[in-house]
Amino acid sequence: MVKNSTSIRTRKRVKKQILDGIAHIHASFNNTIVTITDRQGNALGWATSGGSGFRGSRKSTPFAAQVAAERCAEIVKDYGIKNLEVMVKGPGPGRESTIRALNAAGFRITNITDVTPIPHNGCRPPKKRRV
């Protein structure tokens, strides 16, 4: 006997209007991750240099970070964000170009904070490369 299956309706997520957001930029030596959240820290959208089509050593370029920031801005523009607070973490090459790309995407940057973790003589750093 075959049961009649009822169609399951999935509700479309309602995009709420958010005026202020926080852009978290994690710029490592190998990649750049851009995440835009609301004030409470709920992620609205994210993009990476690697996910933007750059592989290998091209992931760690300022241009790849710029493209990732543009993609992230495109994802979250439906939320109506006008102002962004920027939190930059890490020593990577995409720090400055990401902020410039977010500014060019139409966001008003209100605050830039460096939240790079600095050890108080914690773990031993990796040894120097010999090429």
From Swiss-Prot:
It comes from Buchnera aphidicola subsp. Acyrthosiphon pisum (strain APS) (Acyrthosiphon pisum symbiotic bacterium). Belongs to the universal ribosomal protein uS11 family. It comes from the Bacteria. GO terms for biological process: translation. Pfam families: Ribosomal_S11. HAMAP family: Ribosomal_uS11 (MF_01310). PROSITE patterns: RIBOSOMAL_S11. Part of the 30S ribosomal subunit. Interacts with proteins S7 and S18. Binds to IF-3. Located on the platform of the 30S subunit, it bridges several disparate RNA helices of the 16S rRNA. Forms part of the Shine-Dalgarno cleft in the 70S ribosome. One of its GO terms (molecular function) is rRNA binding. One of its GO terms (cellular component) is ribosome. This is Small ribosomal subunit protein uS11. Keywords: Ribonucleoprotein, Ribosomal protein, RNA-binding, rRNA-binding.
